[in-house]
């Protein structure tokens, strides 16, 4: 399963750099995620990168883009010129900053090698080539660095100078999923939650009233422990019903 031909486990993202977006604080450094009516299950983000410049983008699972037959650039323009028009009225798009790409997600598959086969004769795959992008946040740098560290631990430049044995590749694959599997699986669950408009609205309303739930939602972007709690059926039932 080296190639995901149907693109079931891919997201697409479109990014621009804007200067002077209203309500953005360089010092605070807050990352904003917005789930906007009319473009769900996609999400819109804004975060500062310094000197009054913001990274502004839009992301959506590739399968959902195909279903809706939409372009991410058009969806982002719809959000900026509609719901966020006031915040962008004095902002300036930085020329040449528009870029789109596909993200190979680390969501679990029904295969023996998860998330996808990451080894072959004489090689190990790391980062995006191993499909390690977080399905919920779209972040991939941390997992790429971790996979590189794991790959190095299985390779000896003297012993393996004529090529990496398949058995070592298999061990690397198992260690990779043992290390990242739970986190990626929980992120996949969170990604699926955002496909249900009523659940997103209900969850956000409850989070506005409950500090603990609001904290978990914020920490889920960076904390494995918070993601585990947030995908617990009992915790969700307790917070969302009572």
In which residue ranges do the predicted regions lie?
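Predominantly flavin-linked oxidoreductase catalytic cores and closely associated redox partners
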Residues: 1-91
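Electropositive phosphate-/nucleotide-binding environments in soluble metabolic enzymes
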Residues: 8, 69, 138, 142-145, ...
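Flexible, active-site-adjacent loop/turn segments at secondary-structure boundaries
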Residues: 12, 16, 31, 37, ...
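A general structural signal for short secondary-structure boundary/capping elements
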Residues: 31-38, 60-63, 81-83, 91-96, ...
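FAD/FMN-dependent oxidoreductases across multiple families
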Residues: 66-154, 159
């Amino acid at each position: 399963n080296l190639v995901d031909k149907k693109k079931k486990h891919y997201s697409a993202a479109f990014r621009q750099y804007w200067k002077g977006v209203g309500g953005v604080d360089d010092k605070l450094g807050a990352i904003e995620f917005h789930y906007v009516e009319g473009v769900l299950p996609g999400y819109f983000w804004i975060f500062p990168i310094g000197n009054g410049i913001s990274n502004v983008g839009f992301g959506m699972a590739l399968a959902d883009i195909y279903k809706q037959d939409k372009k991410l650039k058009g969806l982002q323009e719809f959000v900026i010129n509609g719901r966020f028009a006031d915040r962008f009225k004095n902002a300036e798009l930085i020329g040449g900053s528009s870029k789109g790409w596909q993200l190979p997600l680390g969501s679990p598959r029904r295969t023996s090698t998860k998330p996808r086969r990451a080894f072959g004769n004489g090689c190990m795959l790391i980062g995006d080539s191993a499909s390690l992008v977080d399905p919920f946040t779209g972040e991939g740098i941390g997992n790429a660095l971790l996979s590189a560290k794991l790959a190095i631990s299985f390779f000896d430049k003297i012993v393996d100078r004529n090529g990496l044995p398949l058995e070592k590749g298999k061990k690397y694959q198992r260690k990779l999923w043992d290390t990242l599997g739970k986190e990626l699986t929980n992120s996949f669950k969170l990604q699926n939650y955002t496909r249900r408009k009523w659940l997103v609205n209900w969850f956000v309303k409850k989070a506005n009233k409950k500090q603990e739930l609001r904290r978990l939602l914020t920490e889920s972007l960076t904390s494995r422990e918070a993601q585990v709690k947030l995908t617990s059926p009992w915790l969700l039932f307790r917070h969302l019903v009572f």
